[in-house]
């Protein structure tokens, strides 16, 4: 006989936080939003900790390399979408890992007998303005000079000018030995007023380039999420079909964490995928799993060895899984149920497995609710799709600037691997839509504004950390009338005057 749940499931919109005591030190500047990304034993620390509890969704229209770089600068992490070829996904991961490494392996290189046209082509392809000239045109050839925009011919139509005739030769370059520390390299850049400092070995082979822009950027971005080599952290999505080929390529490219991307993660296919990764890499490769919406699903993936588990089916703004298949659960109820099972699992095993709330976030305060209910971090699609750094184009519709946003279950994404249970047969219907979202500008400004709200609400609850919020939060269900009462009502808001229609 089928199991029935008597209580209806709820969304974040049906809850509010009740204020707690705010002490004198409860001010937003004192709030610490760091949170674990992967599982750890009681008494130990997670091997990867986010500095902010936000990650971008594994979607074509959200998480490309620009998004990954921008979010890592702010302390979060992106999961590069897997609905593309293995080679292109690995290339995106590689680009993020090498964007700011302190010591950067040059990806813009020419030989001295090449031309200005070649320099322009490389700069356009890589978006880098410093081109290394090596004897063989490789990243680690003998360094002969550099070409920057200051070396360009006055007449830019002289595209046949030889590189050897326009470059700044090695004899005029300031360089440093490969034993030089990053702090020492930055000091040289600062004192010599350089934009780029080539790092060479004893035989004049180019090893790396240290850029001034990376130093300047690090002074502004104090919250950057980087590895031990000062490279940005980046995640990548995988599926349960080609994981035997995709995972090694992503690991080789430098992915810091993987996540199985599926609309329904309560599946033996995910267990098989995790098992294969554990057999080949042990615990060195971190992999999340999901999505699930109840404690039973959590327990299955926890026992399978998942490093974190995602919660949510059908709650995304572009997801139509619920109306197509009748599968899913209200996001708030799902988080509450899964967190209860996670806490029980922790008591039984001493292993803390972070959970991610994926979907259902409409307003910024929903982020705070998800965290208060026990989520360790939040995966967002629509939220990040609005930003300049998302990989979609901007369009103007009825005078408003919009960005395209489509679901991985839409025909446009054609990523059927996410929306089946494995095997060879693929589904023939959509579980996502193709849409637009209002353009919101740069990621940095928007994330800062959203997290300021989260911090302020945490202070209202008397909490300075996410664990404190989860232990102190007082959460109440609200009626539909209370929801109306919570917004502006019985007035005509000035910026909405053109939309006013008397009853």
Swiss-Prot record:
Keyword Transit peptide listed: no
Binding site for NAD(+): 261-263, 312-314
Primary localisation category: cytoplasm
Effect of residue 319 to S: Has less than 0.06% of the wild-type activity
Binding site for IMP: 317, 358-360, 381-382, 405-409, 431
Keyword Isomerase set for record: no
Binding site for K(+) 2: 20, 22, 264, 266, 460
Miscellaneous comment text of the record: Contains 2 potassium ions bound at each subunit interface. The second potassium binding site is not conserved and not observed in crystal structures of IMPDHs from other organisms.
Functional note: Catalyzes the conversion of inosine 5'-phosphate (IMP) to xanthosine 5'-phosphate (XMP), the first committed and rate-limiting step in the de novo synthesis of guanine nucleotides, and therefore plays an important role in the regulation of cell growth. Could also have a single-stranded nucleic acid-binding activity and could play a role in RNA and/or DNA metabolism.
Name of protein: Inosine-5'-monophosphate dehydrogenase
């Amino acid at each position: 006989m089928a199991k029935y749940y008597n209580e209806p499931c709820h969304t974040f919109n049906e809850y509010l936080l009740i204020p707690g005591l705010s002490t004198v030190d409860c001010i937003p500047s004192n709030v610490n939003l760091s949170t674990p990304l992967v599982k750890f034993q009681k008494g130990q620390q997670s091997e990867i900790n986010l500095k902010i509890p936000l990650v971008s969704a594994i979607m074509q229209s959200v998480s490309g390399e620009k998004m990954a770089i921008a979010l890592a600068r702010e302390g979060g992490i992106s999961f590069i979408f897997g609905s593309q070829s293995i080679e292109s996904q690995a290339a995106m991961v590689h680009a993020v890992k090498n964007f700011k490494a302190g010591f950067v392996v040059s990806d813009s290189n020419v030989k001295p007998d090449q031309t200005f046209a070649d320099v322009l082509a490389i700069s356009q392809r890589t978006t880098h303005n410093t081109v290394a000239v090596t004897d063989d045109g490789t990243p680690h050839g003998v360094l002969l000079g550099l070409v920057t925009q200051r070396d360009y011919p006055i007449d830019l139509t002289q595209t046949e000018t030889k590189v050897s005739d326009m470059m700044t030769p090695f004899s005029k370059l300031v360089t440093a030995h490969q034993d030089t520390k990053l702090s020492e390299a930055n000091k040289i850049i600062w004192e010599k007023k350089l934009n780029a400092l080539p790092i060479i070995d004893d035989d004049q082979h180019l090893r790396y380039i240290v850029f001034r822009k990376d130093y300047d950027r690090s002074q502004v971005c104090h919250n950057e999420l980087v590895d031990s080599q000062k490279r940005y952290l980046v995640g990548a999505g995988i599926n349960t079909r080609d994981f035997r080929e995709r995972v090694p390529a992503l690991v080789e490219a430098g992915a810091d964490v993987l996540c199985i991307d599926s609309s329904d993660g309560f599946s033996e296919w995910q267990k098989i995928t995790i098992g294969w990764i554990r057999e080949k890499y042990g615990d060195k490769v971190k992999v999340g799993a999901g999505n699930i919406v109840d404690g039973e699903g959590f327990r299955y993936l926890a026992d399978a060895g998942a490093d974190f588990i995602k919660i949510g089916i059908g709650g995304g703004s572009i997801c139509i899984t619920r109306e197509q298949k009748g599968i899913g659960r209200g996001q708030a109820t799902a988080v509450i149920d899964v967190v209860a099972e996670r806490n029980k699992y922790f008591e039984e095993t001493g292993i803390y497995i972070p959970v991610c709330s994926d979907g259902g976030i409409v307003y910024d305060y929903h982020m705070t609710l998800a965290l208060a209910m026990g989520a360790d971090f939040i995966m967002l699609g629509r939220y990040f799709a609005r930003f300049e750094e998302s990989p979609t184009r901007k369009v103007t519709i009825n005078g408003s600037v919009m960005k395209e946003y489509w679901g991985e279950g839409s025909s446009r994404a054609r990523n059927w691997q996410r929306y089946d249970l494995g095997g060879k047969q693929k589904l023939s219907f959509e579980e996502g839509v193709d849409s637009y979202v209002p353009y919101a500008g740069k990621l940095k400004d928007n994330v800062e504004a959203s997290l300021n709200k989260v911090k302020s609400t945490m202070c209202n609850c008397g909490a300075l950390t996410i664990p404190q919020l989860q232990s102190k939060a007082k959460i109440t269900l609200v009626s539909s009338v209370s929801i109306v009462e919570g917004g502006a009502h019985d007035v005509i808001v000035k910026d909405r005057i053109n939309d006013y229609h008397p009853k």
